[in-house]
Amino acid sequence: MSRVCQVTGKRPTVGNNRSHARNATRRRFLPNLQTHRFWVESESRFVKLRLSAKGMRIIDKKGIDSVLTDIRARGEKI
């Protein structure tokens, strides 16, 4: 399973670790992904999504039905 938020599309980014001597070694910054189950009243079922903390906030603001419509419009199967 890829480390990509299904709502925002956030994915790992790359950067540097920095030691006290300012030596740079490459590293990955991973998104804060959570697997969360949402009850969808219109479909009378639970939907399991893998999303970031920001994705959860978007669902709180817009509603699960609106977000699912956007995800399906992108062609993702839920």
UniProtKB/Swiss-Prot annotation:
SS bonds (residue pairs): none
Residues covered by region (Disordered): 1-25
Coiled coil: none
A GO cellular-component term linked to this record: ribosome
Pfam families: Ribosomal_L28 (PF00830)
A GO MF label: structural constituent of ribosome
Annotated keywords: Ribonucleoprotein, Ribosomal protein
InterPro entries: Ribosomal_bL28, Ribosomal_bL28/bL31-like_sf, Ribosomal_bL28_bact-type, Ribosomal_bL28_sf
Biological processes per GO annotation: translation
Family to which the UniProt record says this protein belongs: Belongs to the bacterial ribosomal protein bL28 family.
Name of the protein in question: Large ribosomal subunit protein bL28
Gene source species: Alteromonas mediterranea (strain DSM 17117 / CIP 110805 / LMG 28347 / Deep ecotype)
